[in-house]
């Protein structure tokens, strides 16, 4: 019978015997080859989120549209985003060990990560279900949408464990350079969600409850698929159910790198909760417009986040392999490509704002408010690029605390100060959303200065 040591040796030999293009191939090609599956995967993830909004908005009403977005989306992001941030520590650790061909350590990281997903899923389910009404009231959710919003968020958190397992499993696959299969799983999940949305919301008239049920069932499917692939692989990241447990030292390493990213996500979302509360105070029409904008706006975030994930894995594997020149070239290349993509998307969204909004609602007042928001924010997208790419780069080398502090001060604290001081002087949607480009600009400048002058990858003053 084959021993664990023999299995590890064979897995290592499998990796050594094949060329790892991420550390040897043409940089821009490798970034794009990794980027596109992540982009399309994120697109389908956003598509099934948008499907809820489109179907309930068109077939149930603007109150239902507000219920499945707005405050519920922000609260979901608060908890799920914290976990995804923590799980980024696993992605970084696995990518570095995989780049260094350390099979045993990859195995410890994989099984600890899945164990963490299971425990976190149970905890998040309990918190989400019990705290939902209180949290929605705290955010000044309008009374006419409080009931359906509570229903949606409670059903969502009852099935949240599928989301967490998928995100962790997809992160493991991306860490070893496989960004295609997470895409395939999301396509299957998205199509399932759309079919179930139509069946539950339109066919069975289940309203927001049907939309939530469709979402958690489709997420469960993606979780099953990603676990199936991890269990069938012959590579060093193979998952064996009997080995799923916490390794204390590995868990500490994962949390040490992932906790800053998790806290960063919480701080982002906490400041967004304050913003959402300010938006809620402007009425249901503005909440509906903001909800629809968040779905349109997701086009930008899925592009920039896909580049952020790509550069994290690229940097992690090349840093693990000791190829520092490729790290620096990769950062420059990724920044340039992201800038081009951002400008192109901004032009398209700005010029087709009305068409975008009419996908979600035909209410003239909601569309008018939404176009005003979009025309103000879209031209400022470019100010965020450096935050995503440089924070992803620094996470790739395990430097995550300083980026968290930069984001805390530059984004969260400054955003809160703006909302508490400027909005009372002029309580208007543009005053509220101005907090985004203001904080993006300040934080981007701080990231550039840290990366060039003070980080482990610093360019200025670096010994040659």
Residue ranges of model-derived segments:
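Helix-terminus/linker motif at the lipid-water interface of multi-pass membrane proteins
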Residues: 43, 47-66, 136-143, 199-206, ...
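Transmembrane helical elements of multi-pass membrane transporters/channels
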Residues: 33-52, 155, 166, 189, ...
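Alpha-helical transmembrane segments and their lipid-water interface positions
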Residues: 45, 49-56, 80-87, 91, ...
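Interfacial/gating helices of multi-pass transporter permease domains
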Residues: 56-77, 143-148, 208-209, 250-257, ...
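Residue-level signal for short hydrophobic patches within transmembrane helices
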Residues: 24, 28-47, 51, 75-82, ...
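Small-residue-rich hydrophobic transmembrane alpha-helices
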Residues: 65-126, 163-182, 289-353, 384-407, ...
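Short alpha-helical transmembrane segments in multi-pass integral membrane proteins
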Residues: 1-35, 94-159, 203-259, 315-380, ...
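Short runs within selected transmembrane alpha-helices of multi-pass transporters and secretion channels
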Residues: 87, 155-174, 182-190, 211-226, ...
């Amino acid at each position: 019978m084959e021993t664990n040591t023999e299995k590890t040796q064979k897995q290592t030999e499998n990796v050594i015997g094949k060329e790892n293009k991420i550390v040897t191939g043409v940089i821009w090609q490798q970034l794009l080859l990794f980027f596109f599956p992540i982009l399309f995967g994120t697109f389908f993830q956003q598509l099934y989120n948008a499907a809820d909004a489109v179907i309930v908005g068109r077939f149930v009403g603007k109150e239902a549209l507000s219920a499945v977005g707005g405050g519920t989306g922000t609260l979901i992001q608060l908890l799920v985003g914290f976990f995804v941030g923590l799980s980024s520590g696993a992605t970084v650790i696995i990518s570095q060990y995989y780049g260094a061909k350390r099979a045993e350590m990859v195995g410890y990281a994989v099984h600890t990560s899945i164990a963490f997903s299971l425990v976190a899923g149970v905890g998040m389910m309990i918190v989400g279900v019990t705290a939902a009404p209180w949290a929605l009231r705290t955010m000044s959710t309008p009374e006419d949408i409080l009931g359906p919003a509570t229903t949606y968020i409670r059903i969502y958190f009852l099935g949240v464990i599928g989301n967490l397992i998928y995100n962790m499993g997809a992160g493991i696959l991306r860490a070893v350079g496989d960004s295609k299969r997470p895409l395939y799983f999301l396509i299957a999940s998205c199509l399932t969600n759309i079919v179930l949305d139509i069946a539950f919301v339109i066919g069975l008239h289940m309203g927001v409850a049907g939309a939530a049920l469709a979402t958690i069932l489709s997420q469960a499917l993606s979780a099953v698929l990603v676990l199936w692939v991890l269990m069938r692989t012959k590579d060093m990241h193979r998952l064996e159910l009997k080995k799923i447990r916490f390794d204390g030292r590995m868990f500490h390493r994962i949390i040490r790198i992932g906790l800053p990213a998790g806290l960063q996500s919480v701080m982002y979302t906490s400041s967004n909760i304050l913003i959402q509360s300010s938006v809620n105070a402007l009425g249901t029409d503005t909440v509906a417009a903001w909800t629809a904008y968040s779905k349109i706006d997701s086009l930008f975030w899925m592009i920039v986040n896909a580049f952020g994930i790509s550069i994290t894995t690229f940097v992690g594997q090349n840093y693990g392999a000791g190829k520092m020149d490729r790290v620096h070239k990769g950062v420059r290349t990724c920044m340039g490509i992201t800038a081009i993509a951002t400008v192109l998307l901004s032009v398209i969204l700005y010029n087709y704002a009305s068409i975008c909004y009419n996908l979600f609602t035909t209410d003239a007042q909601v569309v008018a408010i939404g176009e005003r928001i979009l025309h103000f924010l879209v031209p400022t997208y470019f100010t965020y690029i450096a935050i995503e790419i440089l924070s992803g780069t620094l996470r790739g080398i395990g430097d995550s605390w300083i980026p968290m502090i930069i984001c805390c001060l530059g984004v969260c604290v400054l955003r809160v100060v703006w909302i508490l001081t400027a909005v009372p002087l002029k309580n208007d949607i543009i005053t509220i959303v101005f907090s985004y480009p203001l904080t993006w600009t300040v934080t981007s400048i701080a990231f550039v200065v840290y990366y060039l002058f003070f980080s482990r990858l610093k360019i200025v003053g670096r010994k040659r």
